[in-house]
Amino acid sequence: RDFIAKEVTPVYHEWETEGHPPRKFYNRLGDLGILGIQAPEEYGGGGESSLKFNVVVTEETAAAGVTFGSYSVHSNLILPYIMQHATDEQKQRWIPGFASGDLMFAIAMTEPGTGSDLANISTTAKLSDDGSHYVVNGSKTFITGGALADRILLVCRTSPFDPENRRGGLSMLVV
């Protein structure tokens, strides 16, 4: 509560005008241990497995009539994907910065014409001829956290659409 009262509420109107908090705000959340509370300690996080701390943040910000910008998507949506699907090398590369606020993530799922119906997305990613990278083609809207993102978790189709298995061929890439 003190943090919100002293460091968020007085400048919140500026964030609203700008459309997002300043980048240094996320570093401050990292300093306080809020941003990476569920990241494993071995990667610089708080090591908490419970969502209770995230619920406290949600309740306190709601009571003050403010938000922490893309904090919720960064911490509650993207981190679990990284923890479940990233390689150990990727976790070592991304999670320390994720927890400190030095590396901000956004998520790109929604597309014009399909909304968040992921089974019908048309954004594609094809492996380059030399196999070193993917070439992405398509459109996304409502990229939550995109204004300050260093990395974007992108949902795309890496195999052709199959009407018998509409979700087949969907992948998540970090770009």
Predicted stretch roles:
Residues 69-89, 115, 127-130:
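N-terminal glycine-rich flavin-associated loop
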Residues 117-137:
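Cytochrome P450 C-terminal beta-domain/meander region
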Residues 94-96, 113, 122-124, 140-144, ...:
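A generic local secondary-structure boundary/capping motif
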Residues 42-44, 109-114, 141-142:
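Short, solvent-exposed loop/turn elements at beta->coil junctions and helix N-caps
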Residues 132-175:
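A short core secondary-structure module
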Residues 79-85, 107-108, 119, 161-162:
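Flexible, glycine-rich active-site loops centered on histidine and acidic residues
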Residues 101-109, 155:
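A short, Trp-centered hydrophobic/proline-enriched beta-strand micro-motif
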Residues 1-72, 89-93, 97-100, 104:
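Amphipathic, small/basic residue-rich leader segments at the start of a protein or domain
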